[in-house]
Amino acid sequence: LKHSGVGLYNNRTKYIWDFATQFWAKPTDFYLTTKKYHVKKRDSIVEKIIGLGMAKVSFALEMIHPNVARVLCGDVHQLRLYGMEHLTYNKSKQGATKYKRMEQHWSVNCGKLKVPSYIARCVYWDALQEKEDSRYWSYVLEG
């Protein structure tokens, strides 16, 4: 971590260690096991893992369950789309409420269109990048 240049490597080392310890002690605490309550599960994971907020945990759940995850990675681009680019939501109850309202709005509208939330977010991101598909970045996930 120190040589990666990500910064805060002392904290990150501790956070990764704590996450690994908790995960391997009870992996099911981190699984989406039902078709609903994804936001509740995400929030419980956020409470367990120091150093990760709603957007990062949502991103992981989106990547693991791209067709069914009912959470939204509210990154800067998503926040900007909703006119909330300065929203602080990880340490603010009011901010978290606004984040969840945005997330619900996005999920409901994706559901109406019968497009998985994550897929719609990827299409939006590709459009921002002026790309027709995700191959410009997704190649890094291939073996």
Task: Annotate the PLM regions.
Residues 1, 79-82, 110:
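Hydrophobic alpha-helix position signal
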Residues 1-51:
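Alpha-helical ds-nucleic-acid-binding substructure associated with the helix-hairpin-helix region
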Residues 11-15, 56, 119-120:
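Residue-level detector of well-ordered alpha-helical segments, enriched
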Residues 12, 74, 98, 102:
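Hydrophobic (often cysteine-bearing) scaffold residues that line and stabilize catalytic clefts
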Residues 21, 92-143:
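A basic, often C-terminal nucleic-acid-binding module that engages the phosphate backbone, implemented
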Residues 32-92, 121-128:
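Catalytic DNA-binding helix-loop module of base-excision-repair DNA glycosylases/AP lyases
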